[in-house]
């Protein structure tokens, strides 16, 4: 049995393309583009001049548009100017009205100022007359005022004494309260100490009772052992007496 031949023939693509020959192109080639017909310099100049001149129809259209635009601008300007004039007139009217109102207010304020000044002068005169009357009454009542001053001083002294007494009484009360608080604070401590001593006594009693119980249990155990031993002795004696005859 021989091996199968898996080899494949190698085909050179470049050689295959050469053997096929030149490809038929459907469109224009590069050479056709390079060999295209070109205009002369004179023809180019003529075209540029035509572009600069432009068409007559376009020029007429542009002129009409410019005229219409100019008319619209003029109308808009007229409207704005008329609006500005009307606003300026309104402002002038307002200013005039303000001036008139200011004149009326100034006249009214001047009248009010004059009336207020007259009222102020009258009030000052009244105050001066009152002061004079007070001075005269003070001169006449000077001895009475001295007596009243002495009475007021004595009253003030008695009030001060009362205040000092009240303060001392309050201090005493506060001290007594503080002492009572201390006593109440110390009392629970003493009760605690008493409770501790009571606890010690209770524990000692418990220990004693426990010891007594242990003693009683020991005694009972000894008695039981003694009874058992005596019973055994009696049994032995009975058995020995029965065996002897």
UniProtKB/Swiss-Prot annotation:
<feature type="compositionally biased region" description="Basic and acidic residues">
    <location>
        <begin position="209"/>
        <end position="219"/>
    </location>
</feature>
<protein>
    <recommendedName>
        <fullName>Protein FAM133B</fullName>
    </recommendedName>
</protein>
<feature type="compositionally biased region" description="Basic and acidic residues">
    <location>
        <begin position="69"/>
        <end position="80"/>
    </location>
</feature>
<feature type="compositionally biased region" description="Basic residues">
    <location>
        <begin position="89"/>
        <end position="102"/>
    </location>
</feature>
<feature type="modified residue" description="Phosphoserine">
    <location>
        <position position="82"/>
    </location>
</feature>
<feature type="modified residue" description="Phosphoserine">
    <location>
        <position position="195"/>
    </location>
</feature>
<feature type="region of interest" description="Disordered">
    <location>
        <begin position="69"/>
        <end position="245"/>
    </location>
</feature>
<comment type="similarity">
    <text>Belongs to the FAM133 family.</text>
</comment>
<dbReference type="InterPro" id="IPR026766">
    <property type="entry name" value="Fam133"/>
</dbReference>
<feature type="compositionally biased region" description="Basic and acidic residues">
    <location>
        <begin position="165"/>
        <end position="176"/>
    </location>
</feature>
<keyword id="KW-0597">Phosphoprotein</keyword>
<feature type="modified residue" description="Phosphoserine">
    <location>
        <position position="193"/>
    </location>
</feature>
<feature type="compositionally biased region" description="Low complexity">
    <location>
        <begin position="103"/>
        <end position="119"/>
    </location>
</feature>
<feature type="modified residue" description="Phosphoserine">
    <location>
        <position position="190"/>
    </location>
</feature>
<feature type="compositionally biased region" description="Basic residues">
    <location>
        <begin position="128"/>
        <end position="140"/>
    </location>
</feature>
<feature type="modified residue" description="Phosphoserine">
    <location>
        <position position="191"/>
    </location>
</feature>
<feature type="region of interest" description="Disordered">
    <location>
        <begin position="19"/>
        <end position="38"/>
    </location>
</feature>
<feature type="compositionally biased region" description="Basic residues">
    <location>
        <begin position="220"/>
        <end position="237"/>
    </location>
</feature>
